[in-house]
Amino acid sequence: MKLRANRVGEQMKKELGDIISRKIKDPRVGFVTVTDVQVSGDLQIATVYISVLGDEEQKENTLKGLAKAKGFIRSEIGQRIRLRKTPEISFEFDESIGYGHRIDTLLHEINKEGKREE
């Protein structure tokens, strides 16, 4: 069953990217990238991880805009993907991109310090 949940998650990720970029007209929703979709084993709940370009205020506004459009997004997913029941969708920020950027910055600093000591 886990394989099916992964396949549904990948298909939802592809469709959500298209829906958010082309169908959502809310001005609060800025430049959004869907980084991952985790679907529960029973295909009832989908957690959508997003990355938003901008400051904290823009991120919060984007999350509010997506929450407002959740019903529309779910109905679009239901039309595009044939499932018995469309999963309940929740949006969360993907912190891994910022975390990865921080690690990259620290590694560059360590590399610079190592070259100075030589």
Curated annotation (Swiss-Prot):
Gene3D superfamilies: 3.30.300.20. InterPro entries: KH_dom-like_a/b (IPR015946), RbfA (IPR000238), RbfA_dom_sf (IPR023799), Ribosome-bd_factorA_CS (IPR020053). Pfam families: RBFA. It is found in: Cytoplasm. The keyword Nuclease does not apply. Disulfide bonds: none annotated. One of several proteins that assist in the late maturation steps of the functional core of the 30S ribosomal subunit. Associates with free 30S ribosomal subunits (but not with 30S subunits that are part of 70S ribosomes or polysomes). Required for efficient processing of 16S rRNA. May interact with the 5'-terminal helix region of 16S rRNA. This is Ribosome-binding factor A. It comes from Bacillus cereus (strain AH820). The gene is rbfA.
